[in-house]
């Protein structure tokens, strides 16, 4: 069901739209943990290591595609907010056609480059064949990844975040069921796990299309799914490419940080992995609030309602601030019991607690950066979000390399490197947002 977000109280609209986004991502994080448990338990340590070492590349490809869909979704929100159903149809069909061609080319490229990319990451020879096979199967299904993310992004752009949540839950349940069947019953190893991922996304695409046919009249395009509007393509590429590059930049930064952590020893790696799981639960809702703010602003911008655009932005910032206070308190005061959920070794727990307590003190900073980025996306200025994310990751990686590799600091150096990145991000973003406010463009 679509939701017109250009009327009604803004705070309830934003909260109700954000909650399914948060639940969906938390569900995805939980699934990722279960997926690793199944591989580790029923296949073995080599397979788990192969899947684990493949995940950064797999995540990079998926986030790139997700970025394309996010950028295209903003254009759909603008058209829907303006009440231009015909433009919504042309935007959706054009993105679907162009995205399909791109996904097939991207998929083939990734399949070919899987081996050299894994070698670049210095994957041990004994698990390299397992990792290559796993990655090639996942990369082979990137067309389904695109359509699943595109349909979900389109429904969110139309104000329907609940349906996207339901389909994410269905996909995750299918994936877990497929993992158990292919891995435990058929004994297909990590390849079975990869096949389960591809098939679950393919089935979810079918379910999405059935639902759209049944419940979303504006997307019941029929033959119009094959309409390609070249006049829309340039803007779609601009939004999609910029958003995709931002997502890719963030993931590349994470890979670089992990490489630096790997030089600190096994205990630090384990502590960082445990604390990193908690970090995900801290950051993801902040990102979701930013994405919800984007949709609300874009619909109202399309409708020409400047006051609601401005009010939506500041409402998003307030929610970001409130969540930051909550998650800071939880992670600081309950750091040790939370870390012990993941590890039991005393030395690892000690390192993990130190990291989590320190980084939690700065959670207000990413809440501000995510809120501001949501605002820029809602205004259609994605270049600023790309530039600020690049500054963030460059500063973070450079600071981590300085603190850890040159100054030989321990795990407590990493939160400070995060702060360097966030400060650079805010120093760049804040003046830009002030300019928008002073010019009356927000």
Q: What is the meaning of each model-derived region?
A:
Residues 26, 30-49, 118-125, 181-188, ...:
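Helix-terminus/linker motif at the lipid-water interface of multi-pass membrane proteins
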Residues 60-63, 175-179, 204-209, 281-284, ...:
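Hydrophobic transmembrane alpha-helices of multi-pass small-molecule transporters
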Residues 5-42, 56-71, 75, 100-107, ...:
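N-terminal transmembrane alpha-helices
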């Amino acid at each position: 069901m679509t939701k017109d977000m250009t009327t009604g109280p803004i705070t309830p609209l934003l909260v109700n739209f954000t909650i399914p986004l948060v639940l969906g991502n938390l569900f995805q994080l939980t699934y990722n943990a279960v997926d690793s448990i199944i591989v580790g338990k029923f296949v073995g340590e080599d397979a788990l290591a192969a899947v684990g070492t493949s995940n950064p590349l797999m995540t990079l490809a998926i986030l790139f595609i997700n970025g394309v869909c996010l950028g295209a979704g903003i254009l759909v929100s603008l058209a829907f907010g303006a009440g231009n159903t015909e433009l919504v149809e042309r935007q959706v069909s054009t993105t679907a056609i162009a995205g399909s061609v791109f996904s097939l080319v991207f998929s083939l490229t990734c399949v070919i480059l899987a081996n050299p990319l894994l070698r670049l990451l210095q994957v041990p020879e004994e698990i390299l064949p397992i990792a290559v096979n796993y990655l090639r199967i996942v990369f082979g299904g990137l067309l389904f990844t695109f359509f699943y993310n595109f349909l979900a992004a389109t429904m969110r752009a139309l104000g329907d975040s609940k349906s996207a949540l339901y389909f994410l839950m269905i996909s995750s349940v299918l994936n877990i069921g497929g993992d158990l069947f292919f891995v435990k019953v058929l004994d297909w190893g990590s390849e079975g796990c990869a096949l389960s991922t591809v098939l679950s996304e393919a089935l979810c695409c079918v379910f999405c299309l059935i639902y759209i046919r049944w419940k979303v009249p504006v997307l019941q395009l029929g033959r119009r799914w094959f309409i390609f509007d070249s006049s829309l393509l340039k803007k779609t590429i601009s939004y999609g490419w910029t958003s995709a590059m931002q997502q890719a930049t963030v993931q590349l930064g994470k890979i670089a940080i992990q490489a630096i952590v790997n030089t600190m020893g096994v205990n630090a790696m384990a502590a960082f992995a445990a604390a990193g799981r908690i970090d995900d639960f801290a950051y993801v809702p902040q990102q979701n609030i930013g994405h919800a703010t984007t949709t609300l602003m874009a619909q109202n911008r399309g409708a020409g309602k400047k006051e609601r655009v401005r009010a939506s932005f500041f409402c998003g910032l307030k929610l970001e601030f409130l969540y930051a206070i909550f998650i800071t308190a939880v992670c600081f005061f309950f750091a040790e019991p939370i870390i012990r959920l993941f590890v039991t070794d005393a030395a690892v727990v000690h390192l993990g607690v130190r990291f989590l307590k320190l980084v939690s003190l700065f959670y207000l900073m990413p809440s501000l950066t995510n809120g501001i980025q949501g605002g820029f996306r809602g205004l259609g200025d994605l270049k600023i979000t790309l530039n600020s994310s690049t500054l963030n990751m460059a500063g973070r990686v450079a600071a981590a390399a300085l603190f850890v590799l040159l100054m030989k600091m321990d795990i407590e150096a990493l939160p400070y490197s995060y702060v360097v990145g966030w400060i650079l991000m805010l120093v760049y973003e804040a003046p830009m947002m002030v300019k928008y406010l002073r010019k009356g463009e927000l």
